[in-house]
Amino acid sequence: SIKVQEMGEKLAELNDKYLRLYSEYENYRKRTNLEKADLLINGSREMMKAILPVIDDFERALAATEDEGVKLIYNKMLKILEQKGLKAMEVKGEKFDENLHEAITRIPAAEEAMKGTVVDVVEKGYYLNDKVLRYAKVVVAF
């Protein structure tokens, strides 16, 4: 009968609308979860980046003092930051790598084997969760 056929068509139409809405909702949910995760990661990144100059100042202060209290505070702060994924780059003596280092200046190499090697670090570089947070500013032998 025509009535049953109309009901069948209406049911198919409503089912189609339902599936589309459900699909849209799932996509929205996934997108907002990704945005939230991205916000947390980038917020953490920006916070860590803002703290790096404080770490630099702390290290300069440590070089000028023998105060054990200052050393304890520095070590405690560094340990917390490391637990959050911060890691200093160890680059002195390594081959220069433009993906990790920023060459501030170049000096003549004392020997052939030293060419292209980082001979001094002007400003430490850091990783955050194994991604470069700040490039190491270095002096390279040529």
Where do the language-model regions lie?
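Short, conserved loop-to-beta-strand elements that form functional interface hotspots
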Residues: 94, 111, 121
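A hydrophobic membrane-anchoring alpha-helix module
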Residues: 117-142
